[in-house]
Amino acid sequence: MKRHPFLPRREFLRAGMTLAAATLAPSTVLAQTELLTRPVPSTGVRLPIVGIGTNRFRSGDPAWTARLRDTLATFARLGGKVVDTAPSYGDSERTIGAILGETGLRDRLFLATKVDRDAIDDGRRRLEASFAALGTARLDLVQLHNLRGAGTLLPLLR
């Protein structure tokens, strides 16, 4: 019988069986029972320290949108909560709004967006457009994007 110079048959079989058995074991990556969280200072609500950014959550062909929907559903199923978006991320707010409407995930997520206008009226319109695009009456967090208009927009956000 000819022997392979690098891996004897017995070791090859042992490695193959070990690999096969490993696929039957629960994944340790997904086995984590609880995400690391921190409390929001003003409310005490605990949120995971890691969220999902949605700059690339833009509409495309139906297959791409299905992948985005699956990604967001998996994120929520594994305990993710914070979803961060912005009007400047193309049509990501509209895409996320459609996905939230289809999946019913809105109440399970902490939805954050941004505003970045110099004038208060422009900022108000930008926020109203975000509410409409996201298909929600509630935003959990509104951030100043790049601090643009901070002096005029802070009163609006309060």
PLM regions and their residue ranges:
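Residues at the C-termini of beta-strands that transition into short coil/loop
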Residues: 16, 115, 145
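N-terminal binding-site loop/beta-alpha segment at the start of enzyme catalytic domains
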Residues: 2-109
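Conserved beta-strand positions
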Residues: 52, 85, 113, 141-144
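Glycine/proline-rich, positively charged
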Residues: 61, 118-158
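Residue-level recognition of the N-termini of beta-strands and the immediately preceding loop/turn
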Residues: 108-110, 139-140
